[in-house]
């Protein structure tokens, strides 16, 4: 029905804009959130910061079309193995829909953080 149409519309428009699903500590250390890499920061913002910074969009639940644009140092961004569509589904469902961990068994045993 209607929810399916909204979901498909959001996926079709945002899947192209979002390059990678990432994990970042936000709004403070020790609290993690899903974000989407939208590009590498360029121009004045990059030139003012001492680190290489990435554009990370932090969506709101259940509507991932609104959210926050954060400029986060690359070293503080963890790339996830889930696809963009899986990440959007996770956000839209409020975490009810959670994709399987696609990493190898050995990688699962090594915490990144």
Predicted regions and their residues:
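Transmembrane alpha-helices and immediately adjacent membrane-cytoplasm interface residues
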Residues: 1-14
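Terminal membrane-proximal soluble interaction domains of membrane-associated proteins
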Residues: 17-113
